[in-house]
Each structure stands twice: as C-alpha cells, then as structure tokens.
Amino acid sequence: MPVSNFVNTADIIRFLPEIILSVMGTVLMVLDPIINRRSSNAFGHITLLSLVAALIGSVYAYTEAGTAFGGMLVVDGFATFFRVLVIAVGILTVLPSYRFLRRQDAETSEYHALLLYSIAGQCLMASANELIMIFLGLEISSISSYILAGYLRDDKRANESALKYFLLGSFATGFFLYGVAFIYGSTGTVNLSAVHAALTGPNAPSPVFTGVAAALMFVGLGFKVSASPFQVWAPDVYQGAPTPVTAFLSAGPKAAAFAIFFRIFMTAFAPIANGWEPLVWISALLSMTIGNFAALMQANVKRLLAYSSIAHAGYVMVALTARSDVGTAAAMFYLAAYAFMNIGAFAVVSHLSGKGEKYQNVDDFAGLGQKQPVTAAMLSIFLLSLIGVPLTGGFFGKFYIFKAALESHLVWLTVLGLLNSAVAAYYYLRLLVVMYMREPSDATANAEPLTLGLRAALFLPALGTLVLGIFPSWVLEFAGKSSNLVK
C-alpha cells in the first residue's frame, strides 16, 4: 500500500501537537551544550513557546477533526479537550520551575525536554483510537515521568520516589498490556470501535475473556490515576519528587490516564458495563474514603495533597460509575477544575519550601496571611475549590458529578461522596486556619518575594478556578458535545 494512502496532509495536521512537542524536546537536548545554563532562562522560555505552539496546534487540529493514520488516532472534541488540558498543565508546571531549578542549581535541558516528551505522550493517549497506540502514549509519558521524579540525583528522597514509581508503574503497565493481549486474542482487533462492535455482534467472545481483560486494564489504569486500592505509590512519590514535578504528576498524567480510562471503558467495554461497574464503584468508594481519612493525619503538605489526589480520583470514578454521557462530561469538567486548583496549590508549596525543600509541613505555613497576603489569598482560593465551595470550579465539578450519579440512580454512592467531601473540608480548613490565625513561622518570615513566573503560576490557576466557578457553562457545553465516545 502506498504511503500516500496511509499518511496525508490532514493526518499531519491532526498529529501536529505531538510533532511539535517531540521535535522541540529534541531541539532542547541539542541546544544544551550551546546555552549557558547558569545565566539564562532560555530552556524555560523555549519550553513555554513550544507548549504555546502545541496548544495552538491542538486547536487547529480540531478544524480537521477525524481519524488519522488508518484509524489509529482520532481527533474529536474529547481528544482536543484533554490535549489542551495537559498542555496547559505543562505551561503551569514550567512557570514555577524557573525559580525551583535555579534555587536547586539544577537548570538543564533534560528537565524541560522530559517535560515535553511526557506531554507528547499524554496528547497521544488522549487521541489514541487503538489499544497499542494507547500503550505507546502511556509508556512515553510514564518513562519521562519516572525520570522527572528522580531529577534531583543527589536527593535521596527523589531517588527513592523515582525507584518506587518506576517499579510499581512497570508492574501496572504489565497488567494493562496483558489485558490488551486478552482483548486481541478474543476479538482479533485492538481498535476500540471494532472491539465494541465485536462485543455486540452475533459472534461475541466469551464474557470470561473480556471480563478478565477489563479487570486487567482496570488494574493498570487504576495505578496511573492513583485510585484505591492501587494508590500506595502516590504519597511517597509526591513527597519525594521535586515539587513542580509533583504538581505535574498530580494533574497532567492523571488527566491523560482518565481520558483513556473513559475512552476504553465507555467505548470498547460499554457492552459489558454490568461486569466492570462493581470494580469502579468499589474503587471510587475506597479512593474517597482512604484518601480523605488518611489526609486528616498528615503533617506534610505534599503528602496531604497526595492523599487528597487519591480522594479526587474517587470522585472522578463516581462519574465513570454513572456510565453516561452526562457522567463523562462531568468528569471532563472536574478534571479541568482539579488541574487548576491542585497545580496552583503545589506552586505555593514550591514557593515556600526553600532550598532543599525543607519547609513542607502544615506548621510551616503559619502566618502566611500576614507576610504574603497575596500568596495566602491564592492558596485560599485553591483550598476552597478543593473543598467544593460555591463560586469555584471545584463546586461545580462535584455538583455535576453527583448530579450524573443521581441520574443513574446511584443515590448511596452520592451520599457517601458528599459525606467524604465534608470530611475533606477539615484538613483543608486546618491549613487555612494555620495561615491566618498563627504567628509567622521561619518559612513564611523568610519567604522570598514572588518572581514573575511564580506570580503567573498562581494567578493563572486562580483565574481558571474562579472562571470555571462563575462561568461553568462554556466548558460544560463543550464537554457535553464531546462526551459521546461510541463512534
């Protein structure tokens, strides 16, 4: 078959974000010997420009919506939403990284190149229409993330977190790939739409094989989104990794993994939903409960936010349990809101942690409202959104998820989710009380002024959080139009 029959100009346009990110990641590596890393922010500037170009490329690719490369990729509203989201997360990761890398004397091209490669993998995950392409995107993103977690080579905590992340991540990937093998063996295809057709056809394979495949993939993806009972890696990795990397891991890879979670289970496995639904609601309940109650006992803010991340994965799993387009749209909205509020909170942690990241405890935030009222106000917005207070993105995110659950008659799961949200309010409010009601700690008393990059890293997520809380309809409308995944 001629290459021209497989690849055309439209295919290149649909693949544009991944091309830009991959090429620019390589360009950064080539420029490393040329640029004076100690006196220049050039790596960060090039990375930001690359991400902005990829963002524009994602929007432009949507004008050529359709399948690419023989159906291996699909550019639709769902893919575009998550492409834009993970690239935005990348931009918000680079902004606080300027000071962090300079403070740790760790400014190299590798950091930014790995970030671009990881985001390229996440974009591929969002647009993949075949299980093998999903696997490739997953591995590109994961391998880059493993290295980023251990980027500070002289930090024992970072090395330990990277090793745990790599070992457990590889184990989870094995489960996912084994599930792919079961699906291919039973249906003869790895195309998601073709798998759906095979499971609904007259010669549908044995439900035993497809059920095992769904369970294996659930285990692999459950690890990637840090959902219970596969969450054990998250607190240690989030605490040990460099804080900007932790912010990135908590938002970008999680959003991309949920994108393929919904793409696979709401497309390929939709005909056997009665089989996998119990797995999802059990995981949702465990994630919300374990995450929130474990967070109550944390003194380290990064560990607290790690357990909070587990709980928020549970809320998204509630949307998946709903098994509806409304639930998918609600999850899309929630992941966008969560990305803004979580990455903003980690940006504040990065700002206060100091050289060597020694200030990470809740008590270290004492007096922040007195010493840096703007920083405290930004963190307050993020924490209130994580609670789900009205006029924030977190409120409408939870509202739409629980609304979708009620429409699917999941009353008991909705009630338990609301109770868990009440529990979560305690540990978020505790941090607010410490910031405003206590005398300044050494960390806040000696905190450096906000740099331009950090100001942007705080104001942009805060703006996104408030916009989604005050004007949620424009995002929700697009998510609603993009939520029907069965092609």
PLM feature spans:
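Alpha-helical transmembrane segments of multi-pass membrane proteins predominantly involved
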Residues: 1-487
